Amino acid sequence: MDVLTQCIVGISLVLFGIYGFIAILIYSFEREDKLEAKRRNEIIEYFTSNGFKYNDFSTIFPNDVRDFNIAHTDKKGYSVKNYIAETYGQRDGVDITIVDHTYLESIGRQRGCYEHALCLLRNQEIKIPDFYLRNRIFILDSIKKLFGMKEIIISEDKEFSKKFVLQGQNEEEIRNFFNSSIRQVFILNQKRGCEYESKNNSLMVSKRKYFLFMTAGYLNVKERIELLENSLKLFNSFKS
């Protein structure tokens, strides 16, 4: 094989590799688009048949969540990318909105893109103190406490305080609110990847989907239904 032929073969192999890689990328993007379209259609079918309305993009929701820290709005270190697949309606006298939310988080020069679902529940007749609650991460939270992390420990309920980190400004009001029945509802409905925050008598639930130790995109319709039912069960427990 002469030098010219070797060059032609080499260039052909390189081009084949490049075009093959591009073809794989195009296939991956098309497959992802099809899966996302299927997911949204399933969400539309279920929620609209159960009294909810649907928007591909939310323009109202960002204004409702600006005060919530777990919404990761336009605060320092965060920038909102979009609110999509919005479903909203009313159940048991509670106004409920669920959206898929993508945001960018900047720490120094590093920037990461994250997805989670947000469920906002409101009923003006239900009074809730402002609080934040999440699952305890034992090693990480032990380190945070060494650096001054403050939390509200329910000493009479070791199971609850072992499972959750509870925080808020008005400790006495929060302690009175988190009675044994409400604590038990949280324990029974504990889910991986969930955070809870109350502001202005509204409850927001953030739910992340995980694969092993990494976040894994948006919730499917079954997972969104589960988020709805569990969040509503929690919120209704506040009525008593």
Predicted regions and their residues:
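Transmembrane-cytosolic junction motif
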Residues: G20-Y46
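Feature marks short, highly hydrophobic, charge-poor N-terminal signal-anchor/signal peptide-like helices
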Residues: M1-V14
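Charged, low-complexity intrinsically disordered regions
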Residues: R40-D64, N69-S240
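Alpha-helix capping and helix-coil boundary motifs
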Residues: L4, S28-E32, N220
